[in-house]
Structure formats: C-alpha cells, structure tokens
UniProtKB/Swiss-Prot annotation:
Protein name: Oxidoreductase calM
Function statement: Oxidoreductase; part of the gene cluster that mediates the biosynthesis of calbistrin A and related compounds. Calbistrin A is a secondary metabolite with an interesting structure that was recently found to have bioactivity against leukemia cells. It consists of two polyketides linked by an ester bond: a bicyclic decalin containing polyketide and a linear 12 carbon dioic acid structure. The polyketide synthase calA is probably responsible for forming the decalin moiety.
EC number(s) reported in the record: 1.-.-.-
Biotechnology: Calbistrin A has been reported to possess a number of interesting bioactivities including antifungal active against Candida albicans and cytotoxic toward both healthy and leukemic human cells.
Inducing factors: Expression is induced in complex medium (Czapek yeast autolysate medium) supporting calbistrin production.
UniProt keyword annotations, A-Z: NADP, Oxidoreductase
C-alpha cells in the first residue's frame, strides 16, 4: 500500500485554519482555540454567520463566512472570499471538516430525501471542502503543504443499531479520506487525519440529530435500537462524555508538535476500547473463514 503522512508536519507560525461547522460544539471549540493563538489566522464558516458572534469582529486575522457544505457554489464562494480577503497572505494550512449531523431511527422508515441529505452534509460536504483545500495546498511553490482533519466518529468504525445512514456516511468519510491520502505525492506535503471521537458533550444528541418517523415493526422495547436509545439516554443523564475543548486541544497538538500525523485518531478511552474489540472480532472471523477465503491459493497473487 502507498504510505501516508510519511514526513513530520510542521505548522507555520502564521498558519491559516479553515474550519467548517463553527456555530456550536467541536467546530466552535476549535475556532475559539485557533483565534486565541498569536499569529494564526482563522476562516470560520457556518450556514448562519450570526452564529459566529462569539468571535471578535475587529480582529483582522479572523474571517467569518456563511457557507453551506451541501452547496458547491457556496463552498467555491467561501474559498474565493477567503482568497480575496487575505490577498497576498492567502493560504490554507489546516482544514477541519467538522460540519455534520446524525440521522437516527428505524432504517426501514428512512425516506430517500433523508438519506440523501445525510450524505450531502456528512460525506459530500467533506469531499467538496477537501478538494478545494488540496488544490490550494498542492500548488504551493515551497512545498508548504497542509493538514486536513476530517471529523469522522467512533461511528465510522463501529456500527450500532438505529443509525444506519449516519454510520454509512462516516464509513464513507473514512474510506474516501484514506484513499485520497494515499493519492498524495510525498513532495506535496499534504497530511490527512481522520478523527474518531466518541461521546462529546455537544448538542449532537439534540439539535444536531434528526430522527426519522418510527416504524411500528421496531417499536418493541426489546428491539436493539430501542435498547441502545435507553442506554444512551442514561449516559447523557449521567454526564458521560468529554468537552469539545478537549478535541480542540488534541487537534492543535497534533498540528503543532512537529511529528508525523496519525492517519486515524480515536478520541477517548471508550473509542479505543470499542475499536480494539471490533478489530479482535474481525481477526477471529478471518481465522474462521480462512479456508473458504483461499480461492486463489493456486494462482498468481499480488504481493502486499
């Protein structure tokens, strides 16, 4: 396989950050953290720019933009506005693709409109912003490169009942990001990091979650999705999770520590534990089906 992130990443002292979904939660925490760093510039985006009022209007290093990641014209306009605003100083060093929401409910009841909207925001929105950023980064004459954080989730690795299309969108982010990371020429110095947080204390389970109409066939309390809902509700009531500022601190550390960037970054002990458990089960499953899988054992095989 083509290696990724082969060199240490060095964050410029005057780095420009482009962050999506800055109205609340992780995006807001990252924007606030970047805004507090001397010398750094921030391009903070949200569908409603009035939600960015927490950022200083009088700081020339901060640009607040309206951007809808589901609209290609809106994304293109945001990048052009940033280039026009910063002029000769325009560059994008770090991108944080954070805009997204969860669609939960019984899979049989999800409408075509709901499933497409989920992918437009979580997956295609990430794609649009990433491609525009790569275009800027790979054309730098001094191989300045850049770093792209794509916010996935524990849900991009481990799938749970009642969130099929949310999982599908995050699995898509994971696979697409890894593939694109392997397409980058080492000389471009473009790094990727897929971020996989678990329970963050945001409005993700409230205003950032959309629910489908319930399906009567799945209404029973003994159904897996209903049991998970009960479990999650108890966790929220107990205050389970970590603050968005913790995510912001870690991402800034990854960007600024002058070391190799991890392709995947699970956030929380719970995420590491559940991902480890899934990988162990997958290895066991591979052993179980190894005899069935070896259909090419007597043929020429690719060397990996």
């Amino acid at each position: 396989m083509n290696p990724v992130n082969t060199k240490p990443y060095q964050l410029s002292a005057d780095a420009t950050w482009f962050v999506t979904g800055c109205s609340t939660g992780i995006g807001r925490a990252i924007a606030s953290h970047v805004a507090s760093q001397p010398g750094h510039r921030l391009i903070a985006t949200a569908r409603d720019p009035s939600s960015l009022s927490y950022l200083d209007d009088d700081n020339p290093a901060i640009l607040k933009l309206a951007m809808d990641v589901t609209n290609p014209s809106s994304v293109n306009a945001a990048f052009k506005a940033a280039a026009d605003y910063f002029g000769d100083k325009y560059y994008i060093d770090v991108v944080v693709n954070n805009a997204g929401y969860s669609l939960s409910g019984d899979t049989e009841s999800v409408t075509e409109h709901e499933m497409h909207d989920e992918f437009e925001t979580n997956f295609f929105g990430t794609v649009r912003v990433t491609l525009k950023a790569i275009e800027v980064m790979r054309q730098s004459k001094d191989h300045r490169g850049g770093l792209i954080f794509n916010i996935s989730s524990l849900a991009g690795i481990c799938a749970f009942p009642g969130h099929a299309f949310y999982h599908a969108s995050k699995f898509a982010v994971e696979g697409w990001s890894e593939s694109v990371a392997r397409e980058m020429h080492p000389d471009w110095n473009i790094h990727f990091c897929i971020v996989e947080p678990s329970a963050v204390k945001t409005n993700f389970e409230t205003t950032s979650k959309k629910r489908t109409q319930p399906h009567e066939a799945y209404a029973g309390a003994d159904m897996p999705a209903r049991q998970l809902e009960t479990f999650v509700k108890k966790g929220l009531e107990a205050g389970v999770g970590f603050e968005p500022s913790a995510v912001a601190n870690v991402l800034y550390k990854v960007a600024s520590r002058n070391e190799k960037v991890p392709l995947r970054l699970p956030l929380s002990a719970t995420a590491v534990k559940l991902i480890t458990a899934k990988l162990q089960v997958q290895l066991q499953d591979l052993e179980t089906v190894s005899e069935l899988s070896a259909i090419d054992v007597h043929q020429v095989q690719f060397k990996v």
